[in-house]
Amino acid sequence: MERNGEIVNNGSIIIPGGGGPVTESPLDQFGIHPILDLNIGKYYVSFTNLSLSMLLTLGLVLLLVFVVTKKGGGKSVPNAFQSLVELIYDFVPNLVNEQIGGLSGNVKHKFFPCISVTFTFSLFRNPQGMIPFSFTVTSHFLITLALSFSIFIGITIVGFQRHGLHFFSFLLPAGVPLPLAPFLVLLELISHCFRALSSGIRLFANMMAGHSSVKILSGFAWTMLFLNNIFYFLGDLGPLFIVLALTGLELGVAISQAHVSTISICIYLNDATNLHQNESFHNCIKTRSQS
């Protein structure tokens, strides 16, 4: 098969005129390719493999919830699907109660839908890339950055709604000398804003690095397996077992990232709703007003 003047044979690119086969990059699995091109007036809209993967994840979650909750609710003796949904439903409130303090149960309950949707979507979205011929949505930095920034902005709005201008008191830790206040305020502001960036980078880096490692070792084991040499075949058993172990590890990392992201959201919400009774900010303002 020819592609752009090159001959593609068994997943390798053979350049005419010499050079031998050139193996495709392991990063090709993260490429975004249009499936359906749409032109709406002056705007070009394309339905890509990324869009398809996100719709499949959403459809899987909705289908699972529908199967469990149909006919008026679950069964007294839960099956595997109902047990999974109940486990997710019980896990998120317990996490909220553990990580967010100083609030009543009714106030915490308001955060449950956002945190539950984020955790459920991440739980099904991250391991999706381990399925052959699928696409890893969270392997793209723009996707993870958009998710982290939207959550960061929402948490900041919650902090202003609850505390008003007193929300700025988190910029000045308690017991800080007044000459160091400007430097620490700037440092705390940068640290606070960097939370949105760090959450997106952490998820993106874990997904891309792990999936790339599995792809590289899988390609190496596959090549060794089909070499016409018994020693290469026997030597391939080691990399093959490593690939199996790394696949299980990457699946665990993909699931644990949903847990880590949810804990981060709860910690940020706790910092936004509980300012740890920091009074140095008010003392600084009071001193300036009296002088």
UniProtKB/Swiss-Prot annotation:
Classification via PROSITE patterns = ATPASE_A
Coiled coil region boundaries: none
Task: Name the keywords, alphabetized.
Answer: ATP synthesis, CF(0), Hydrogen ion transport, Ion transport, Membrane, Mitochondrion, Mitochondrion inner membrane, Transmembrane, Transmembrane helix, Transport
What are the recorded GO MF terms, alphabetically?
proton transmembrane transporter activity
Enumerate the transmembrane spans.
47-67, 140-160, 167-187, 207-227, 230-250
GO BP terms: namely: proton motive force-driven ATP synthesis
Where's it found, cell-wise? Mitochondrion inner membrane
Which topology term describes how it sits in the membrane? Answer: Multi-pass membrane protein
Superkingdom classification of source: Eukaryota
Q: A Pfam family for this UniProt protein?
A: ATP-synt_A
GO CC entries: mitochondrial inner membrane; proton-transporting ATP synthase complex
- The signal sequence is none
The Swiss-Prot or TrEMBL record describes its family as follows: Belongs to the ATPase A chain family.
Q: Which PANTHER family does the UniProt record give?
A: ATP SYNTHASE SUBUNIT A (PTHR11410:SF0)
Q: What does this gene product do?
A: Mitochondrial membrane ATP synthase (F(1)F(0) ATP synthase or Complex V) produces ATP from ADP in the presence of a proton gradient across the membrane which is generated by electron transport complexes of the respiratory chain. F-type ATPases consist of two structural domains, F(1) - containing the extramembraneous catalytic core and F(0) - containing the membrane proton channel, linked together by a central stalk and a peripheral stalk. During catalysis, ATP synthesis in the catalytic domain of F(1) is coupled via a rotary mechanism of the central stalk subunits to proton translocation.
Listed under subunit, the entry gives:
F-type ATPases have 2 components, CF(1) - the catalytic core - and CF(0) - the membrane proton channel. CF(1) has five subunits: alpha(3), beta(3), gamma(1), delta(1), epsilon(1). CF(0) has three main subunits: a, b and c.
The protein in question is named ATP synthase subunit a
**Source organism of the structure:** Zea mays (Maize)
